[in-house]
Amino acid sequence: MKHKIGNILAAGFAIVGLAALASCAGEKFHVTGSIANAKDSLLYFEHNGLNGFSTVDSVKLDEKGDFSFSGDKVDNPEFYRLRIAGQIINIGIDSTETVDVKATYPQMATDYSVKGSYENEKIKELALKQIDLQARCQSILAERPDLADSIITVLMSDYKQDVSRNYIFKEPMRAYSYFALFQYIVIGNQAHLIFDPSRD
């Protein structure tokens, strides 16, 4: 009798375990939305990994500009981006969430909204700050090349203080804080991390 109950319990646990594995295997995250004024453009969905960016999927947009991408559930935050040519929208993915993006091309890097994710709202704030810093640095390089190095150093220092205080130290365990640590600007065709891992 004891053996029968033990066998039944073991079989029950095995079935529950298999069901749990099967449900986990099918879990997905979704990135959906639309990009206006982008008919016939190729929209790339790219993963930002340790070895750089890799294309996960792509779609040629129709007149409506609707798109839908998905991927397997992630256990740790991962970073992706939506890209048409040089226009980029950064996306953070955590678990099985659905992120909804609405944008307008060709200014989609700055003219977009993101719903369904607190992390991505913060990533957007950081991306806009980065774009503004990049524009200011480019302007200084063009107008004051003799003083550009020292002025850009001050601008980057101010940026780091702002982002550290208002984003990284505020919620250090959030994905957007990790995203902030790897932001960069391009100076003279060379990318420079804003936060230098050897000094900051």
Give names to the regions the model predicted.
Residues K2-G12:
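Bacterial N-terminal signal peptides that target proteins for export
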Residues A19-S23:
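C-terminal motif of bacterial Sec signal peptides marking the signal peptidase cleavage site
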Residues C24-N166:
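A non-transmembrane, solvent-exposed segment enriched in polar/low-complexity residues
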Residues I168-K170:
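Solenoid-like repeat scaffolds
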Residues P172-G188:
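Amphipathic alpha-helical repeat scaffolds of TPR domains
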Residues N189-L193:
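Alpha-helical linker/edge segments of TPR/alpha-solenoid repeat scaffolds
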Residues I194-D200:
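Alpha-helical repeat scaffolds
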